[in-house]
Amino acid sequence: PNLGFYRNFHKILRISDVNYVYRKKNIADYEGVGAKNIKVLLPYYIERNNFKEDCKDTIPIAFLGHFENDGRDKYIKALIDAKVPVTVYNGSDWEKAPLYEGIKSCIKPGKREKEYNHTINECKIAIVFLSKLNSDTYTRRCFEIPATQTLMLSEYTDDLNRMFPADECAVYFKSPEEMVEKCKYLLSH
């Protein structure tokens, strides 16, 4: 969108009865342009698109998502270096990764719609990375993965841990080393 779009968007925020934002951080952004009555509207999943399928766990560990230059390639490289089987779906963005040469063997084309849900169902473990550019503390994928009853392995945030308590509903990591350790443990049990 161009500058005119944002100028009009900001005007509308000031006269709207209610403004919904994606994350708590955005409340201050909206207040900064004069918006009132701001509420967080969490992302969710769509039941007809995200559901448990009767299929085998044929993919040990996967990340289904875009590349962002926030260090996620270091996590994937750490898994590869530790000989932990990992697949990344959504290939083209990942060519921009600083560590692309070391991780390209595990990168596959993206999955959409029915294939996306089916692929998550085939995973024993589905990884969640959070956008640092957007200051995410959760993402829509955090709701889609549990809908399939696939184990969710995610970067830790307080928000996620409140929604999905650690080691009950999800498993969390704070470093590449911890991620590798948890993946090895989970795959062996």
State each model region's role.
Residues 175-189:
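C-terminal "capping" alpha-helix adjacent to the active site of nucleotide-linked donor transferases
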